[in-house]
A protein has these predicted regions:
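Short conserved aromatic/hydrophobic patches within beta-strands of well-structured domains
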Residues: 1-2, 77, 143, 179
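A non-catalytic, helix-rich entry segment at domain boundaries
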Residues: 3-118, 125
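Mg2+/Mn2+-dependent nuclease catalytic core
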Residues: 110-207
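Short alpha-helical scaffolding segments that buttress acidic/His motifs in well-ordered protein cores
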Residues: 1-4, 197
Length: 207
């Protein structure tokens, strides 16, 4: 799922289709047919050197029900792209990047954020000195969408059981806050420019 959605062809397709979609009440399947989403998916899935996509196709081919599983997977990706087209049309936010690795380090007096792909390092002074041990976070920002100076940080969730508002309020879930801080530093943004949100359950798309 992530590899297909992160492909540059998919991102460009979503943005271009979102700009053309004017009827907000269209059903997802109507969007799939109108923009011939299946053609795009076939290009991205079957003409791709991405390791995750290639390995997934090989594993599916080994199963006796491989055709059913493959068609079900393609259909769910179709509906996911249709949802993204509608989202892009309604909100005007555009997907900018997916799966960006970063390293965030907090020590007594500063926060350091490193973009692992480019090696870019940004430092932010805390303004006060704290007696704390070094804290390091390493992870992936699933996705960032942009609209002017504003950005939306999206964290994909894969099941119903790994997220609740109560867990967030009690501090048991901190990923989205960490991702937002990393984006604030990497993009030189103000805190008020960033909206951190949790995304839909990707495991249930199409059900």
């Amino acid at each position: 799922f992530h590899a297909v959605m992160a492909d540059e062809r998919t991102i460009r397709f979503i943005i271009a289709s979102g700009e053309k979609l004017s009827v907000s009440e269209e059903y997802d399947n109507d969007i799939v047919n109108k923009f011939e989403v299946r053609k795009l998916i076939h290009k991205v899935v079957f003409d791709n050197s991405n390791k995750d996509i290639v390995e997934t196709l090989r594993l599916i081919e080994l199963l006796s029900t491989h055709n059913y599983i493959l068609q079900t997977m393609l259909h769910r990706i179709e509906l996911a792209i249709a949802v993204e087209i509608k989202y892009c049309s309604l909100t005007k936010y555009s997907p900018t990047f997916l799966e960006k690795p970063f390293e965030l380090t907090i020590n007594n007096e500063k926060i350091t954020c490193k973009e692992l792909e480019s090696g870019k390092v940004i430092e932010k002074q805390l303004g006060s000195t704290y007696n704390i041990p070094n804290i390091k976070f390493v992870g992936f920002i699933d996705r960032v969408d942009t609209l002017g100076q504003n950005i939306v940080v999206i964290d994909y969730k894969s099941s119903q059981t790994d997220f609740s508002l109560e867990s967030l309020e009690l501090g048991f879930i901190s990923q989205i806050l960490t991702y937002s801080l990393a984006c604030e530093m990497l993009f030189n943004k103000k805190t008020e420019d960033i909206l951190g949100i949790f995304y839909r359950e990707i495991a249930r798309i199409g059900k």
